[in-house]
């Protein structure tokens, strides 16, 4: 080859690389690089966690007694418990533990660790205690209700009648009842905090991966546990990177710098649909986008004001223009797709009707208030749209943006006026899962601190509705139970609740086609232990 032709060849190669950024980079074959927004990643303590982001990390550091099959949610699979039985009276669950499990510290798993972990959730009384308190567990009765006849057996006696299937679903799906290495955590406890401060940035699990490092709003790295009881994971390492800008995530996926990206703006997701190297996984979740009102605020304690706001939201417009890829129109507290879910009531923007309601409530000229929202999409755009239609009715809402702790923290403290948010659990395949999170409020006192219940956060309380929810949960006749759930939704609607469902969440995850056996979980408990990657000629091994 002469010099001219050689030069042309080099130039052509350079041009090819320049025009094909995906050829410039490839992640290592044995590592998974995940891009995500970590603004809501506030703690790694399973008892304190809130939000989908942390759940997806915690379930790969710890194990629970059981888990849900991501492709058939009603299928409960064994985990630390190799088998279990439910008593004839539906009031007792007995779990038999595996005998080959060790924690990352080398300590051997025993029933004492399971019991201590469950006691810890209740005694700390943080976010994840709410569900178990609603089932009747308390710091006073937990020692009698959860016992260990021997080192390999755990017996859970239900304090009050319940559907044992729901309890199993909760143990499997919530992530709150993962089992901690009690000896390791107790050694790190300070001032009777049950190790909470230490576990904020550390872990004490038996899961497929160990925590290497977490630098808040920067990077979190986990490495495989070669001695994991199910067998060593196929990936040596998983790296989660904090990338807040959607365009950055898109560019890095195009270049091959990331294997998986979540929290992307839908326009960027759509732009990647035709990339032959990428796949878009869309998973519908039970989580609901909503507008919440605080009934601690005199304005929103008035049902006529709450009803006025019901008609100052352009549900159809928001879902059509802002929620494509994020969610679908839904106006009921029970997630769609269940036999117990009523059709939507069909609420629409109706400014004249809203103005009349406000005038009747004593606010003919409206009033000033605040609207809290995460500084992320789609939340911010939804809040701006709602601010605009509220203004048409005379309600002047100042938008306050912030991080998850600033926004949801104020809601957990019941120190807010209006809030655009997302919640509703729905992770368990049972109508009670949605109702418990969005509607149920067994104790409206500030001291109750039922912070994982949106009903408590908003100050919405109705004793009859609580009783109806309790009764429906225990109904054994399937047809009657469905009718009970219909009646609950009708009463909830008539009460003009403090939380208005707008859209049901769809989670879009962009995945490089080199990634194999990655199955996004509707409950956010996505397991990474079996994930692997096809080799790439430009990818190296672990460094």
Predicted segments with their positions:
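N-terminal lobe/hinge region of extracytoplasmic solute-binding protein
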Residues: 35-88, 119, 202-208
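A structural "hinge/loop" feature
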Residues: 39-55, 77-80, 107, 129, ...
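Gly/Pro-rich hinge or "lid" segments in bacterial periplasmic/extracellular proteins
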Residues: 70-71, 173-232, 237, 351-352, ...
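Aromatic- and charge-enriched surface segment that lines or borders ligand/interaction sites
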Residues: 82-128, 155-157, 165-166, 249-252, ...
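Ligand-site clamp/hinge motif
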Residues: 197, 225-271, 388, 396-398
């Amino acid at each position: 080859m002469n010099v001219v032709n050689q030069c042309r060849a080099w130039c052509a190669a350079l041009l090819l690389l320049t025009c094909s950024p995906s050829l410039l980079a490839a992640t290592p074959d044995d590592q998974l690089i995940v891009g995500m927004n970590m603004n809501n990643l506030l703690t790694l303590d399973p008892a304190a966690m809130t939000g989908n982001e942390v759940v997806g990390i915690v379930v790969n550091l710890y194990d629970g007694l059981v888990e849900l099959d991501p492709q058939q949610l009603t299928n409960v699979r064994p985990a630390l418990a190799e088998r279990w039985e439910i008593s004839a009276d539906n009031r007792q669950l007995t779990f038999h533990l595996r005998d080959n499990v060790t924690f990352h510290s080398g300590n051997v798993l025993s029933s004492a660790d399971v019991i201590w972990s469950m006691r810890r959730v209740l005694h700390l009384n943080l976010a994840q205690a709410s569900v178990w308190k609603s089932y009747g567990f308390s710091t006073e009765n937990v020692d009698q209700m959860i016992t260990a006849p021997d080192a390999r057996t755990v017996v859970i006696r239900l304090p009050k009648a319940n559907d044992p299937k729901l309890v199993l679903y909760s143990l499997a799906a919530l992530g709150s009842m993962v089992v901690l290495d009690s000896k390791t955590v107790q050694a790190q406890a300070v001032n009777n905090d049950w190790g909470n401060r230490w576990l904020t940035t550390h872990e004490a699990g038996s899961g497929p991966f160990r925590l290497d490092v977490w630098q808040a709003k920067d990077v979190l790295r986990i490495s495989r546990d070669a001695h994991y009881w199910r067998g060593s994971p196929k990936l040596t390492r998983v790296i989660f990177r904090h990338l807040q800008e959607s365009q950055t995530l898109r560019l890095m996926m195009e270049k091959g710098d990331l294997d998986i990206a979540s929290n992307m703006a839908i326009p960027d997701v759509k732009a990647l649909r035709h990339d032959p190297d990428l796949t878009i996984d869309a998973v519908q979740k039970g989580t609901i986008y909503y507008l919440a009102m605080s009934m601690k605020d005199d304005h929103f304690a008035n049902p006529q004001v709450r009803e006025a706001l019901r008609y100052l939201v352009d549900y159809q417009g928001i879902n059509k223009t802002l929620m494509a890829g994020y969610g679908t129109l839904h106006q009921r507290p029970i997630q769609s797709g269940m036999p117990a879910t009523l059709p939507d009531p069909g609420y629409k923007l109706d400014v004249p009707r809203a103005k009349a309601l406000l005038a009747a409530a004593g606010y003919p000229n409206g009033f000033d208030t605040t609207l809290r929202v995460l500084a992320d999409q789609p939340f911010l755009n939804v809040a701006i749209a709602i601010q605009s239609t509220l203004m048409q009715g005379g309600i002047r809402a100042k938008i306050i943006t912030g991080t998850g702790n600033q926004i949801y923290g104020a809601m957990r403290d019941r120190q807010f006026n209006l809030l655009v948010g997302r919640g509703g659990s729905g992770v368990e395949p049972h109508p009670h899962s949605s109702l418990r999170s969005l509607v149920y409020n067994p104790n409206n006192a500030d001291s109750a601190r039922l912070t994982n219940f949106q009903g408590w956060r908003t100050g919405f309380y109705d004793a009859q509705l609580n009783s109806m929810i309790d009764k429906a949960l225990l109904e054994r006749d399937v047809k009657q139970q469905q009718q009970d759930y219909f009646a609950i939704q009708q009463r909830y609607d008539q009460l003009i609740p403090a939380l208005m469902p707008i859209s049901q969440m769809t989670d879009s995850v962009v995945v490089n086609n080199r990634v194999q056996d990655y199955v996004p979980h509707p409950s956010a408990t996505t397991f990474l232990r079996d994930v692997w990657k096809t080799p790439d000629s430009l990818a190296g091994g672990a460094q």
